[in-house]
Design a protein with these regions (language model features):
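N-terminal presequence-like segments and the immediate start of the first folded domain
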Residues: 3-101, 105-118, 124-170
């Protein structure tokens, strides 16, 4: 009895190019290598809410900070007195100082300080106060200040003069 070997020729070149595979000759015949398995779905980074003990409870649905891996995202803070949750008197100078003190408490609760801050976004209600804002800001970031954007806005909660948010990295 005769043996017949049937060889099927598959048109795979277009498919191989499409999926990034190629033909490989082997001793047993020809085979198509398989595309690499997709990368495993990354596990979401663990995140932890950061809420300092001495911090104004505004009753609003947000966390003062979220620590995700080595990155701390700090919510925008007004110059609120932690004891009363009201704006401190004294205009943009006092509000800027208190907002930065409040942000410092969030940094501290996450085991960081102002040296860990890599980005700041400041919202001010009137650019005529820009230089006064900068004077207080320099007290906290005197050398190697982080990247920053300062934006004038039409209004802030409670009629505040300034709101500051940050990102810090360990």
């Amino acid at each position: 009895m005769r043996r017949f070997t049937v060889t099927c020729i598959l048109l795979v070149s277009a498919t191989a190019a499409f999926v990034g595979t190629s033909w490989h000759a082997t001793a047993a015949g020809q085979q198509v290598s398989r595309p690499p398995s997709p990368a495993p779905t990354p596990t979401p980074t663990a995140r932890r809410a950061i809420r300092p003990d001495k911090f104004p409870n505004t009753g609003l649905p947000y966390s003062p900070g979220i620590l995700a891996g080595d990155t701390l995202y700090l919510s925008g803070q007004l110059g609120r007195d932690p004891a009363t949750a009201m704006l401190v008197p004294g205009g943009i100078d006092a509000e800027t100082r208190q907002a930065l003190v409040n942000l410092g408490e969030v940094l501290k609760a996450a085991g960081m300080d102002f040296r860990n801050v890599v980005s700041v976004t400041a919202f001010i209600s009137d650019f005529k106060d820009f230089q006064r804002f900068n004077a207080v800001y320099r007290e906290f970031f005197s050398t190697d200040p982080p990247a920053r954007a300062t934006v004038q806005v039409a209004g802030l909660n409670l009629g505040a003069a300034v709101e500051i948010q940050m990102i810090a990295v360990r």
